[in-house]
Amino acid sequence: LARITSYTTIQAVYIEQPFLFFKSGGSSAATMAVLQKFNGVVSWVCYNLFDIEPQYLRAQEARKLCGIKVPRGQKAKKVVMDFILDNVPDFDVVYTRQGNPRPGYADRADSYVVAKAGLTRENQETKDSN
């Protein structure tokens, strides 16, 4: 992240807001606690590096800002990955022998969606203030 500041000016930081509730088939309390800690560290690092208070987007809000609709009964991760593969030409995915994306690629796709949603929100706010 520090290297980025050498060639560009960061004006906003958007981070995916972690889940705040349990749902059937979701992450365990331990996993959610680790994600909360990780988000806290990332928020702190971004604030210290860029002197910008991060803004948080729920995953559903980020998908909506990007125009991604998850039909009832479908897995959001798959819908997001399909959207990214269809719309981001330089997004490459490595697959397992079973044809699933290797671990980490769904997270990369989610990160792209949050970043794109943040940019969309910034552009909307700029347009609204003019």
List where the protein language model places each region.
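Phosphate- and other anionic-substrate recognition elements at nucleic-acid/protein interfaces
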Residues: 1-130
